[in-house]
């Protein structure tokens, strides 16, 4: 596998450091005439799927998403990795904190675009769950960045880019989220209570 890019970090403070929770996008090293990409299979293991670029059933016009026999796939798989800094400029990998990988059928293509909300109860991570089933918002809670509680999908498809407010307003929790269906209503930022 090769890392194709680092994207959309969630930023927070922990243990007197500045941390980034990076989205890491990976794919297999590509071979001539073949397009290959990773997915999580039903057993939760990474499986590499490959198609011939010459196949009449392949539409690879978008470098991020391909379609084969009418079924869509992402060309990379994303997961989340922590890096830290004492000065906010120079960051280093923290091996004692494991990456956060996709899990289950709603995260077959991985997890993306994480936001980190710091609360008195720890850290709440909202992120995009990506699969052939749907694109929606997932939620994870942690206090120590080693143990996680997964709450599953909290905003239904097609939805992404969720940010929880870190403090209650009028005794209630709020979040911004983005239903993203240009065909039905457009791309707007919504406020959820």
Question: Residue spans of the language-model regions?
Answer:
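Beta-rich carbohydrate-recognition and catalytic domains
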Residues: 1-109, 117-163, 167-193
